[in-house]
Amino acid sequence: MHRFRCFARVASLLVLASPAFAQAPAPAAPPKAATCVACHGPDGNSTTGAYPILAGQTFRYIYLQLQDFQAKRRSDPLMSPQVEGMTKDEMIALAEYFSKQKPTQTGFKPDPARAAKGEKIATATLCTMCHLGGFAGQNEIPRVAGQQYDYIVKQLKAFKAKTRTNDGGSMTSVASTMSDDDILDVANYVAGIY
């Protein structure tokens, strides 16, 4: 009888405690997200290389990019008008929402030879010093693993040409050392990481 009571107590504690260990539900999409999904896809998983995947991106990176678009430190003919008049709270809500979404694989199949060259270039230029191992990103440094290939190429070329300079000089410095082939190699490598 004593064993049964002990078992019953432990079982009831586990049942009562289980909601405390349950995962919190994903945050509801803020109203402004309805506009974002037209380009960035459902839950921030872009299905075209023209637009970056926002799902799983770092909160701080998303928030700072929205601020930079609004302050004209970064420019894009489609994105810049979207942030005009956006409030700080709306930016925070969007960054919070998209950072908590799960990124999905793009289906990109890297060219093995280019990806191998890209890995060597990424190692030589110390990409993981900022983007971390697995290119997961941190704080204001973006997650680039599994990002859209075309988008990676476009951004590396923009950093190289210094048409995108909202990076504090880090990426413009690194990209300036890359040839166009190097950029394609690195993009093959990074876009293929899942």
Where are these regions (language model features)?
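Inter-heme linker and motif-flanking segments adjacent to c-type heme-binding CXXCH motifs
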Residues: 45-46, 75, 100-113, 128, ...
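C-type cytochrome heme c attachment motif
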Residues: 32-41, 60, 64-67, 92-96, ...
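Bacterial N-terminal signal peptides that target proteins for export
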Residues: 1-11
